[in-house]
C-alpha cells in the first residue's frame, strides 16, 4: 500500500520487501521488476530504509526502455506509542550518479525530499492509519502535498485485507491525483508474508490517468 504506518522492524531486525510493480496509463506501461524495499531496525522506534527498482517502460509505438530507477534513502522515527502511534518518515530520493534514467523517462529528473507524518490506531480489530506530508524539490512538478488513509482488518489468523485512498496535489492545491487501492497480506510462514495490491486513479488532473496499479511481493523478516 502507498500509505505508510508507524511500524518498525525492531532492534537489529531486517524487513525486506521484494516485488513486481506495474503502472498502466494511456499508451504507456511502467514495470518495476524487481522493486527492493529494505528496512533495518535501530532500537525499538527507528527504521533505516533503502529502496530502488529495475524499471521497464514501454510506450505505444516505441522501443522498450529499461534501467535502474532512482534511489530512496529514509529514516522513520516513531516518537509516540501509547495506543495511538505517531511517526515521521523523511525520505530523500535521487537519480543514481552516472545514470541517464531520467532522460529516458524511467524516473524523475530532480532530487526530492518528502517529509511525511504517520498516525495509526486500532479500533477493536480494525486498524486505521493515515499519512500526510510535503515534498520539497527544485522541480515544481514534483513539489506538493501528499496524504492517505488506509483501513485494515485481519479476517482470519495470518490473513489481512486493506482498503486505501491516497492522494497527492500540486504545491498550490490546484491539481491533484487520488488513488484507490485494495490490498491483502497473507502469512506464508512466521517470517514471510505475501503482499498483493491492485488499484487505479479515482481522479487525476496532474497528468495521464492511471488505469491500473499492481503490486505483487514477498516480505521477509530476519
Per-segment meaning from a language model:
Residues 1-222:
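Transmembrane beta-barrel domains of Gram-negative outer membranes and organellar outer membranes
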Amino acid at each position: 500500500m502507498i500509505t505508510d504506518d508507524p511500524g518498525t522492524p525492531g532492534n537489529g531486525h531486517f524487513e525486506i520487501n521484494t516485488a513486481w510493480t506495474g503502472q498502466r496509463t494511456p499508451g504507456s506501461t511502467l514495470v518495476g521488476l524487481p522493486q527492493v524495499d529494505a528496512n533495518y531496525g535501530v532500537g525499538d522506534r527507528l527504521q533505516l530504509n533503502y529502496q530502488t527498482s529495475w524499471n521497464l517502460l514501454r510506450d505505444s509505438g516505441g522501443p522498450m526502455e529499461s534501467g535502474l530507477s532512482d534511489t530512496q534513502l529514509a529514516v522513520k522515527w516513531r516518537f509516540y506509542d501509547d495506543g495511538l502511534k505517531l511517526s515521521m518518515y523523511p525520505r530523500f530520493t535521487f537519480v543514481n550518479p552516472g545514470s541517464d534514467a531520467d532522460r529516458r523517462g524511467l524516473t524523475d529528473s530532480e532530487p526530492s525530499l518528502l517529509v511525511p507524518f504517520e498516525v495509526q490506531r486500532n479500533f477493536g480489530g480494525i486498524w486505521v492509519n493515515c499519512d500526510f506530508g510535503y515534498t520539497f524539490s527544485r522541480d515544481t512538478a514534483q513539489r506538493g502535498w501528499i496524504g492517505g488513509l488506509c483501513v485494515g482488518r485481519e479476517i482470519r489468523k495470518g490473513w489481512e485485507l486493506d482498503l486505501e485512498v491516497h492522494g497527492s496535489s500540486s504545491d498550490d492545491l490546484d491539481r491533484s491525483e487520488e488513488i484507490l487501492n485494495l490490498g491483502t497480506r497473507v502469512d506464508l510462514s512466521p517470517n514471510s508474508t505475501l503482499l498483493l495490491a491492485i488499484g487505479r486513479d479515482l481522479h487525476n488532473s496532474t497528468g495521464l490517468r492511471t488505469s491500473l496499479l499492481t503490486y505483487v511481493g514477498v516480505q521477509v523478516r530476519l
